[in-house]
Regions:
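Ferredoxin-type iron-sulfur electron-transfer modules and their immediate structural context
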Residues: 1-91, 98-171
Length: 173
């Protein structure tokens, strides 16, 4: 407790809890994703997020061919790679993301699967969270919902009840 003898606590420590309490978590199917970011917008816990990787970040990443998509829009992100990454250990399994996903003509880009089968996604989340730089400076994050989700949330890992309707709004501030 060196340096915090007065009882203060550093901000953002909830990200280290990694409770892994959900029986089911979302699985991203890149082939059906239209990159709308609606899933990230409705997630009460900021545990599903779009990451935009440049060539260097992609080369160093754990992703194989087909596990990211080329950015469609905005134009400032052309040539970069899109990945909707799930933090399976912080997800509470509410299913809001799956419910809101429009998908494409082949179906939704998200489905729920058991946590045990998705534990391999945890190191991928860690890679993105620690190594992929925010690209929010490339877009106007206040112009639309899609762009707003490229901003790093200032309210994350809230610990709110599964499916909480308030935290997505607080996350936008």
């Amino acid at each position: 407790f060196s340096g915090i003898e007065d009882g203060t606590w550093p901000a953002g420590t909830a990200k280290y809890e990694k409770r892994g309490v959900s029986a089911f978590v979302p699985v991203w199917n890149s082939e059906n994703c239209i990159q709308c970011n609606k899933c990230a917008y409705v997630c009460p816990h900021a545990s599903i997020r779009p990451f935009v990787l440049d060539e260097a970040e992609l080369a160093a990443s754990p992703y194989k061919a087909g596990e990211t998509l080329e950015m469609k829009v905005p134009a400032a992100m052309k040539g970069m790679h899109f990945r909707m990454q799930v933090d399976v250990l912080d997800c509470l399994g509410c299913g809001n993301c799956v419910d809101v996903c429009p998908g494409n003509k082949n179906g939704k880009a998200l489905s729920m699967s058991d946590l045990e089968s998705q534990l391999g996604e945890a190191p991928r989340w860690d890679y993105c969270a620690e190594n992929v730089k925010s690209k929010q400076h490339l877009v106007d994050i206040k112009s639309n919902v899609k762009n707003s989700q490229f901003a790093t949330p200032l309210f994350e890992f809230s610990g709110a009840c599964s499916g909480c309707g308030e935290t997505p709004y607080v996350k936008l501030i």
